[in-house]
Amino acid sequence: TSYSAKECLEQLTDNGIFTPLQTQEDEFRKDNGFQKPYSTVQGEIGLFLTDAFNCIWKIADAYRKKELPLEKALSDKVLKAILHYGNIELGRPNDGPRFHASCFAIPTAAVNIYYAYLAQMEGAEIGQGRALLRGVCDMLKALGLQAWTQPLRHDETDENVVSISRFRNHVWWVGGNALAYRSLLPVAAMYRSIPMIDLLAEVCQRGISMTSQNTYSEAFWTEGFTADGAGWGHGKQCLIWGYPIDGTSNALSILNLLKGTPWSKALNRDNAEAILNFLRGGSWYYYKGYRLPCLDRGSYVYNPMEQSIPYAKMLDNIVTNWIDSFTPEEQKELQQLQVEVKKNRINMNNYVLGVYNGTRWFFNNDDLIKKTSDYHITVNMASVRCDGLESAVNMADEYNFYPTDGLTLFQ
């Protein structure tokens, strides 16, 4: 939110309602709008509730930073706001989509509010404090749990969300949608749940793997790094950037946090090979500071200035925190790649043709690429085996150029 913590406090009525959101709430209540299962209205409600919880989070964070005294930051009207907007969120129907706000934004705000008031929340958990505070503690934990429960899959995993099958074979629960945008580890810690952290550590390690046309049904995830060095997102969509990187990058970040704990895991050989294979293969889809078209949710994005290859930050994490998981020769390769990535010129000329330069066919996406220091040619072949690109409303192209129907790009 653009409002300051002080402004957010001033906007709260004694009943815990933000005055800038009052008119919108009244409109939703007309004709029982909060219970309508339609995606359009539920999407609007999700944004409305996200605004409310982000304002509460701003107040809580100001207390954490010692910018607000406790008597203001945890006043009755703040507690009532958590309960008011929380009850709206928990009362929404599950027969319509409950994505983005319900599984990403609101649980993230809730768990951060909980930790901002950690001392008070821990007291409430053992029965201390006012009934209003104890109710707020329960509400924040219920909202945070939605990172693990929403959206419903309408299968057996809804009865046991702490299961490996919960995080497989569904676009909402694999790759970036599984690990990058959900506050899974903070919520697991909030619940002090050993089974949750056990599961999360396993999902992170098994998710750093490869899929392919031939192993689609058996692979741990149905998207991410492909066996030829490219990537998929949302099933077989040829999204080299975005989802494949988000899933693995955040798996590595979570495993970073688990180092030095009973859940600490070393990368195994399969993990290392999957990472190195993608770093090599992904470099073919980037040339002298520019991403190629038709590889992300924005089909034809043009950047007038050079940019780093999208996996640059993930590579930095690997070199800094996971270099020991690779052989001495691979370590030298990763360090050289890191140097060249920072220059936006990935040549790696001391490696044989076909690794970073030359001609290469990416069979999972049906891409034929010729890459030299002088020119770059991509033949994106007509392919019934791929699904094109994401065209989601408000967050992608909203249309599709059908980039798997065959085109040739010369750079």
PLM feature spans:
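Aromatic-lined, polymer-binding surfaces characteristic
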Residues: Y3, L9-G298
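Short, well-ordered helical secondary-structure segments
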Residues: A5, T40, A178, N357-T359, ...
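Extended polysaccharide-engagement surfaces of secreted carbohydrate-active enzymes
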Residues: G247, I254-Q411
